[in-house]
Amino acid sequence: MNILDKVDAASLRDDIPEFRSGDTVDVHVKVIEGQKSRIQVFRGVVIRRQGSGVRETFTVRKVSFGIGVERTFPVHTPNIDHIEVLTRGDVRRAKLYYLRNLRGKAAKIKERR
């Protein structure tokens, strides 16, 4: 194990729940505005999980006021307070980019039992 692996292992978080593409999650993000800090919740469907180790990221998509919003988060960043898994999605793909072209009920994901 070289020095870079030790640094990476020290910065990994262990409080991340199991989630994958298709799951609906609440990401509680720390937002700093001036001197004040607050928690902002970003709720949406995980459309991608990519990478491994400290460089792992995931992308969450939601529709806000009729406009699709996607946000990519590093999994092990200290800016995420915690991640809450609301529902487990039943999908057959690892990357759900096709959801970008679907509207309304067609963009719904079945819940896994």
Curated annotation (Swiss-Prot):
GO terms for molecular function: structural constituent of ribosome. One of its GO terms (biological process) is translation. SUPFAM superfamilies: Translation proteins SH3-like domain (SSF50104). InterPro entries: Ribosomal_bL19, Ribosomal_bL19_CS, Ribosomal_bL19_sf, Translation_prot_SH3-like_sf. Keywords: Ribonucleoprotein, Ribosomal protein. The keyword Ribosomal protein applies. GO terms for cellular component: cytosolic large ribosomal subunit. The keyword Ribonucleoprotein applies. Pfam families: Ribosomal_L19. Gene3D superfamilies: 2.30.30.790. Belongs to the bacterial ribosomal protein bL19 family. This protein is located at the 30S-50S ribosomal subunit interface and may play a role in the structure and function of the aminoacyl-tRNA binding site. This is Large ribosomal subunit protein bL19. It comes from Corynebacterium kroppenstedtii (strain DSM 44385 / JCM 11950 / CIP 105744 / CCUG 35717). The gene is rplS.
